[in-house]
A protein has these predicted regions:
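A conserved acidic beta->alpha catalytic loop
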Residues: 110, 122-131, 145, 169
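Cell-envelope/extracellular polymer assembly enzymes that use nucleotide-activated donors
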Residues: 90-92
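Conserved donor nucleotide-binding strand/loop of the catalytic core
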Residues: 131-155, 159
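Short aromatic/hydrophobic "clamp" motif used to bind/position activated sugar donors
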Residues: 165
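Catalytic-site signature of metal-activated, phosphate-bearing donor transferases
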Residues: 151-157, 174-301
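Acidic helix N-cap motif at the loop->helix transition within catalytic regions
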Residues: 105, 127-136, 177
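Short, well-formed alpha-helical segments that are part of the catalytic scaffolds
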Residues: 95-114
C-alpha cells in the first residue's frame, strides 16, 4: 500500500509539473532552482523530479520535433541514457547574427538535432533573419552592435542554460560524416574545452585548403568568455580535448573587407593597448590591405614582447617574411622565415615560402630541399592556420619545376604525377604532362 501511495505521488507530481511548465521552467532554469534541486539530490523523490525536470526543460528549450520534421517525439539526448545510467549533457548553441537570412537555415539544419537549445543574438538585422531563426524555436535576443564581437558572443553565452555550449557562425555548416562525429562528441565531451577543425576554404573539388583548429565546445560551469573585439577567442584553460568533427565555413558573399581594420584603428584612436593576439591580428589585417611597411613594426613588437601563443608567433614570422618579399627584400624575408624555427619545427607553409625564395634566385637544389621538407612535415600535427596545399600539391608541383630546371626529367615527371594525385584535373599538371611528352618525343 505504501508503495502504491508513493507511485501515486510521483505521478501526481509529474502531472502538476506538466501543467505548470512555464513556472517550472522559470524557477528551475535559474541558478537558484538548479542549486535547490542539487542540494536535495540525495532525496530520491527530489532527484527523480530533478531528472524529469531536465527532460521537460529539454523539450521546452528545443521543440524542434515539429519545426523541421523530427521523426521522434523524444529529443535525441534522451533517447537513451549514457553509460553509467546518467543522461547525456544538455547542449546550448550560441550564435550572433546580422542579416544572415540566406545562410542561417542551412546552418541550423545541420546542427539543430544535436543541441537542446538555440541562443541567437541579433545585432541589427534588417532582413528575415529572425523569422528564419523562429522556425527552429531559437531563443532570439537583440544586442546593439558596438564594434565588439566578444561582447555580442558573451551576451549569447550568458543566456545559455545547458551543461555545455558551442558556438557557430551563420555561414558555418556541419557536413557529411562530421555530423555524426559531432554527435558523439556532444554526447560525452569529457573535457572542459573541445577544439575542432575549422575548414575555412576549399578547392574546386571540395577539398579543404585553409584549415585551423578552433576552441568550439565549452563546459558552462567553467565560465569561459571570449576576448578581443575582432578575431575573438577563448583563452584555453582547464582540461582540453581535440576532436575530429570539422566545421565547414561556407560563405556565400564576401563581407566588408575593411570592417576589421576599421575596428582596430578605432580602438587605437581610443588609446586602447592591444593584447598580443590583437597585435598579431591587427598586423594580419594590415598585410591583407597591402600595408606591408606598416605591418612590419607591429609584427616585430609582437615577437619582441614574447607573450604570444606559439602558432601566432610562427604566423608572425611567416607574415613578416611575406612583407619583406613584397618589398623586394629577400634576405630580410629569409631571416624572418628562419626565425620561425625558434618557436617550433619547420611548418610546411614556411618551407614552401623558403623554397620559393630560393627558386626565384635560381638556386634549385636548395629550393628542392625545402619543398621536400614541406612534404615530409605535412603529416605532422598542425596548430593555428595552415594551407593544406602546402603539405602536398604545392611542394610537389614546385619539385617538378626544380628537377626540370636541374635536367632530371624523369624525377620532374614523377613529381608532376604526384601533384596530380593531390589535385585531380589540375590544369598545370595537364600542361606539364603534355610538356614532358613532347620533350620525350623530341629525344627520340
Amino acid at each position: 500500500m505504501q508503495w502504491e501511495q508513493t507511485v501515486y505521488w510521483y505521478a501526481l507530481s509529474i502531472s502538476i509539473i506538466r501543467q505548470n511548465a512555464a513556472f517550472v521552467k522559470g524557477f528551475f532554469a535559474g541558478k537558484c532552482g538548479y542549486f535547490y534541486a542539487m542540494g536535495f539530490r540525495r532525496n530520491k523523490i527530489a532527484y527523480f523530479l530533478r531528472t524529469f525536470l531536465q527532460c521537460s526543460l529539454h523539450h521546452a528549450a528545443m521543440p524542434l520535433q515539429t519545426a523541421k520534421n523530427r521523426t521522434s517525439a523524444v529529443p535525441a539526448a534522451y533517447d537513451k541514457p549514457a553509460e553509467g545510467g546518467m543522461h547525456m549533457p544538455l547542449i546550448s548553441l550560441c550564435m550572433i547574427v546580422r542579416n544572415e537570412e540566406a545562410v542561417l537555415g542551412r546552418c541550423l539544419d545541420s546542427v539543430a538535432d544535436l543541441v537542446d537549445e538555440i541562443i541567437l543574438v541579433d545585432t541589427g538585422s534588417t532582413d528575415n533573419t529572425k523569422a528564419v531563426a523562429a522556425e527552429y524555436a531559437a531563443k532570439i535576443y537583440d544586442f546593439p552592435w558596438c564594434d565588439d564581437f566578444s561582447a555580442a558572443r558573451n551576451y549569447a553565452v550568458s543566456q545559455a542554460v545547458g551543461d555545455y555550449w558551442l558556438w557557430l557562425d551563420a555561414d558555418d555548416v556541419i557536413e557529411g560524416e562530421n555530423h555524426e562525429k559531432l554527435r558523439k562528441i556532444l554526447e560525452a565531451p569529457e573535457a572542459d574545452m573541445v577544439f575542432l577543425p575549422y575548414w575555412l576554404s576549399f578547392d574546386a573539388a571540395g577539398t579543404p585548403q585553409m584549415i585551423s583548429r578552433r576552441e568550439r565546445i565549452f563546459r558552462r560551469s567553467r565560465g569561459y568568455r571570449f576576448t578581443g573585439a575582432v578575431h575573438e577567442a577563448v583563452v584555453p584553460s582547464g582540461s582540453i580535448r581535440y576532436g575530429d568533427a570539422a566545421v565547414s565555413h561556407r560563405k556565400l558573399h564576401a563581407g566588408d573587407p575593411d570592417r576589421n581594420l576599421h575596428i582596430y584603428q578605432k580602438l587605437l584612436l581610443s588609446g586602447k593597448r592591444f593584447s598580443p593576439r590583437e597585435q598579431y591580428y591587427y598586423a594580419r589585417e594590415l598585410c591583407d590591405h597591402g600595408a606591408y611597411r606598416a605591418a612590419l613594426p607591429v609584427l616585430e613588437q609582437f615577437l619582441q614582447e614574447g607573450r604570444g601563443w606559439t602558432p601566432d608567433n610562427i604566423g608572425a614570422c611567416l607574415l613578416a617574411g611575406r612583407c619583406y618579399a613584397r618589398l623586394e627584400q629577400p634576405d630580410a624575408a629569409m631571416q624572418s622565415l628562419f626565425r620561425s624555427f625558434c618557436y617550433g619545427i619547420p611548418q610546411p607553409e614556411i618551407c614552401c615560402e623558403i623554397g620559393g625564395l630560393f627558386l626565384e634566385q635560381q638556386q634549385y637544389p636548395q629550393a628542392a630541399f625545402w619543398y621536400h621538407l614541406a612534404i615530409e612535415t605535412g603529416h605532422q600535427p598542425h596548430e593555428g592556420f595552415w594551407r593544406q596545399e602546402c603539405c602536398d600539391y604545392l611542394p610537389a608541383i614546385q619539385l617538378c619545376v626544380c628537377y626540370d630546371r636541374m635536367g632530371d626529367i624523369s624525377t620532374a615527371a614523377a613529381y608532376n604525377a604526384l601533384a596530380g594525385s593531390f589535385r585531380r584535373g589540375d590544369a598545370a599538371v595537364a600542361y606539364n604532362r603534355q610538356y614532358f611528352a613532347e620533350k620525350a618525343a623530341r629525344r627520340k
